[in-house]
Regions:
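Amphipathic alpha-helices of TPR/Sel1-like and other helical repeat/solenoid scaffolds
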Residues: 1-9, 31-32, 48-55
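Short, solvent-exposed segments of well-ordered alpha helices
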Residues: 16-20, 39, 64
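Alpha-helical scaffold segments of alpha-solenoid architecture
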Residues: 41, 46-184
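Non-membrane alpha-helical segments in proteins
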Residues: 23-38, 74-75
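Internal amphipathic alpha-helical repeat/solenoid segments
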Residues: 1-28
Length: 184
């Protein structure tokens, strides 16, 4: 479908027909963003997000607001957090108008970042079960894994040895099987 977009002659829109083409193009990239995430293809996710964000930013006030806009923006913020791209995360947050910061899809990554700064790892774990869209689970899991790896690195330096039961609690895992999978 993205190849077919190259046949659209009028981007940006200058007539109602052009506007329909732009809306269709935006939707193709939105769905491509979700599809890339579903496939676990982070590079495609980044590419599609970058393209669809152009439609959100450059055509603001020209095209109607997409119903998927905040879901996708929130996903991108989660991506930045989960891959420890903190300065880029803060740059993106600053670009979001204040009125839109209260959107549920934007609040999730903002809350996670706040919990992380506070060291409230239990709140991060509990937020795993309260996602506003199923696609958020992918990056929340990545974020939790990243935290666990940081805790593991610190524990490696701090302890000469540690009991498996204590390690399970330290890494916020609910059972021995999860701990074994994490260690592997």
């Amino acid at each position: 479908m993205r190849i077919d977009l190259t046949f659209f002659e009028n981007l940006p829109p200058t007539s109602p027909v052009d506007m329909r083409e732009c809306i269709l193009a935006r939707e193709v990239y939105e769905y491509s963003t979700f599809l890339a995430l579903e496939k676990g293809d982070i590079e495609s996710f980044e590419r599609n997000f970058t393209t669809v964000k152009t439609y959100y930013d450059e055509f603001d006030g020209i095209l109607p607001v997409s119903q998927k806009k905040f879901t996708i923006l929130g996903l991108y913020l989660l991506y930045l957090l989960s891959f420890n791209k903190i300065s880029e995360y803060h740059t993106e947050i600053e670009l979001i108008p204040i009125a839109e910061l209260s959107n549920v899809f934007i609040k999730v990554p903002m809350s996670l970042e706040q919990y992380f700064v506070e060291g409230s790892y239990n709140k991060i774990l509990s937020s795993k079960h309260n996602v506003p869209h199923p696609a958020y689970q992918f990056f929340i899991d990545k974020f939790i894994d990243a935290i666990r790896y940081e805790v593991a690195r610190s524990a490696e330096r701090a302890y000469e040895s540690i009991a498996m039961k204590d390690m399970q609690g330290l890494f916020m895992l609910s059972n021995q099987g999860e701990l074994s999978a994490f260690i592997d």
